[in-house]
Swiss-Prot record:
Pfam families: LbH_GLGC, NTP_transferase. The gene is AGPB1. GO terms for biological process: glycogen biosynthetic process; starch biosynthetic process. The lineage of its organism: Eukaryota, Viridiplantae, Streptophyta, Embryophyta, Tracheophyta. Its EC number is 2.7.7.27. It is an enzyme of class 2 (transferase). CDD domains: ADP_Glucose_PP, LbH_G1P_AT_C. SUPFAM superfamilies: Nucleotide-diphospho-sugar transferases, Trimeric LpxA-like enzymes. One of its GO terms (cellular component) is amyloplast. This is Glucose-1-phosphate adenylyltransferase small subunit, chloroplastic/amyloplastic. It comes from Beta vulgaris (Sugar beet). GO terms for molecular function: ATP binding; glucose-1-phosphate adenylyltransferase activity.
Length: 489
């Protein structure tokens, strides 16, 4: 359960609506031989139509060969998730619950499936049991039909005679499993993060990569000056080719990273508002290029964003930017996680919507009954499946699966992650007889007259033995915690 500093027995969470608009111009390129990286004869001009690169709903993609046979999706599960602790105490970061019914990993997997990419690996090395269980239950082993041999598989870090160490970074994680990835007869690898919230058509991303004859294509997010200092920025030439990188620049270095974003499809007005482009940590990399970069050019590089991609630019590879102008959020901290979840309750239009029929978000079928609300006052909230809510007040909150909320509770600006199971009547009677608290919210047991309001506006506190943490002023009740009756946090 996560709660802000001004809520009463509350926790928060939000999701957001996304859309994107991209376009391109005529581009002329010269080629680099993928394996040897020597300059060869120049190619004929390549025309990238605005529709082809656009992420608008009216545009069409004509990939040949199609993505289901020619693209391998690789989702990086991230590190230990220390900034999301205690949510990552017993689970990998991609397995953290999201939007009442989902988990973070459902976002990139659903984007892949909606983009006709059905061969997907998820790399992880921390607390992967719940992630593995969720993926095996949510996604069939023959997705896309037997012809396309679709799958979603978890690859956990493992030691071997060649690699005695755990994953040292994003690039090292991919390098350790290159022996498996290169067995697939594909043209490109699509590298994704497992902790981002957005909706994107990867087919158009791949199409832009092919039409510009790029070796690597980096998804780029337009930025204003205020946000730009927190991201790794890129500079492009008039063809959309990346020529320079800067990690979280400030002052004169920041000004030097301004680019003309109309090159990537923004209109003049928006280009003035957003004169910077930031890397989203999402890449399309041609297969031969990936093998050469990780094994021969940069065998000691551990990270894509800070080492491999800038290194590829320095040796003359064609590294293109692909603009994504839609909602995107990095769910890397408690504050970002809380705000993104509560964003789905935003009026009149949420930041991210799960109600998009054209590109749905998939998850594990749980076969839960409809939620039951008895004399409850609920406003501006999202309620998950299988909840029982009795005579209480809920405002601007997200209520997770199987949540049982009893009479008199007041929940505002709060995210409840839900419970893993229901307690039987016999269990509840037994607990009541010995003075204990029945399960209710997210496997946490919260007694009568408890107030979780952070009235002192504490910003940081670690009270794990008491069952809660405070980060950025947001109170998080940990899983399986028991908060005794009358407690004030």
């Amino acid at each position: 359960i996560t709660v802000p500093s001004t809520s009463s027995k509350n926790l928060q969470n939000s999701l957001a609506f996304s859309s994107s608009s991209l376009s391109g111009d005529k581009i002329q390129t010269t080629s680099f031989l993928n394996r040897r990286y020597c300059r060869i004869s120049s190619r004929a001009p390549i025309v990238v139509s605005p529709k082809a690169v656009s992420d608008s709903k009216n545009s069409q993609t004509c990939l040949d060969p199609e993505a289901s046979r020619s693209v391998l999706g690789i989702i990086l599960g991230g590190g230990a998730g220390t900034r999301l602790y205690p949510l990552t105490k017993k689970r990998a970061k991609p397995a953290v619950p999201l939007g009442a019914n989902y988990r973070l990993i459902d976002i990139p997997v659903s984007n892949c499936l909606n983009s006709n990419i059905s061969k997907i690996y998820v790399l992880t090395q921390f607390n992967s049991a719940s992630l593995n269980r969720h993926l095996s239950r949510a996604y069939a082993s023959n997705m896309g039909g037997y012809k396309n041999e679709g799958f979603v598989e978890v690859l956990a870090a493992q030691q071997s005679p060649e690699n005695p160490n755990w994953f040292q970074g994003t690039a090292d994680a991919v390098r350790q499993y290159l022996w498996l990835f290169e067995e697939h007869n594909v043209l490109e690898y699509l590298i994704l993060a497992g902790d981002h919230l957005y909706r994107m058509d990867y087919e158009r991303f791949v199409q832009a990569h092919r039409e510009t004859d790029a070796d690597i294509t980096v998804a780029a997010l337009p930025m204003d000056e205020k946000r730009a200092t927190a991201f790794g920025l890129m500079k492009i030439d008039e063809e959309g080719r990346i020529i320079e990188f800067a990690e979280k620049p400030k002052g004169e270095q920041l000004k030097a990273m301004k680019v003309d974003t109309t090159i990537l499809g923004l209109d003049d007005e928006r280009a003035k508002e957003m004169p910077f482009i930031a890397s989203m940590g999402i890449y399309v990399i041609s297969k031969d290029v990936m093998l050469n970069l990780l094994r021969e050019q940069f065998p000691g590089a551990n990270d894509f964003g800070s080492e491999v991609i800038p290194g590829a630019t320095s040796i003359g590879l064609r590294v293109q930017a692909y603009l994504y102008d839609g909602y995107w959020e990095d769910i890397g901290t408690i504050e970002a996680f809380y705000n993104a979840n509560l964003g789905i309750t935003k009026k009149p239009v949420p930041d991210f919507s799960f109600y998009d029929r054209s590109s749905p978000i998939y998850t594990q079928p749980r076969y839960l009954p409809p939620s039951k609300m008895l004399d409850a006052d609920i406003t501006d909230s999202v309620i998950g499946e299988g909840c029982v809510i009795k005579n209480c007040k809920i405002h601007h909150s997200v209520i997770g699966l199987r949540s049982c909320i009893s009479e008199g509770a007041i929940i505002e600006d709060t995210l409840l992650m839900g419970a893993d199971y229901y307690e039987t009547d016999a269990d509840r009677k037994f607990l009541a007889a010995k003075g204990s608290v029945p399960i209710g919210i997210g496997n946490a047991r919260i007694g009568d007259d408890v107030k979780i309001i952070n009235s002192d506006n504490v910003q940081e506190a670690a009270r794990e033995t008491d069952g809660y943490f405070i980060k950025s002023g947001i109170v998080t009740i940990i899983k399986d915690a028991m908060i005794p009756s009358g407690t004030v946090i």
